[in-house]
Amino acid sequence: MQHGNGPDIIYYAYANKDFTDIEGEPKPLFLPKNEKSCIDGDIIYKDGLYHLFYKTEGNGNGIKKATTSSLTSGQWTESDDYKQQTKDAVEGAGIFPLIGSDKYILMYDVYMKGKYQFTESADLEHFKVIDHAVSMDFHPRHGTVIPITQKELQRLFKAYGKPEGFCSKGGSSTHLN
């Protein structure tokens, strides 16, 4: 979010108990030390740290990472390197655990090419491209992955129908019906 002529920064706010409004005013969550814009943050908790993946702007654009042990403390440690594995312009980082594995997937929108790139890591520092292992029959922009239970999947099928040709391999290589 941007105020006036200032940089875009990542804010946080809390929803009320009914999820109809926010409580109080949004507060800054993260602003890089260089005070340049940052957008598209996604956070994952691992080994006692919150890992924030975000897009830098105005100073070498790409996906960087910052970590903290206290999410709203304002005390972040920033990585110097870029995490994307392409020279193409990227945004919309999403990070999630690969169920049934000790690995994580970092995906991001290679927006000038209209595609996503998928990378894999066990330590959230070093990533390798795994595009060959991923197939998609849709074209999201700034996608998010949310794990769901088998019961939640069945409720979604009941409410919206099962997509034609749907077959998902879970962490135990089980095909979902």
What are these regions (language model features)?
Residues 1-89, 98-171:
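Beta-rich carbohydrate-recognition and catalytic domains
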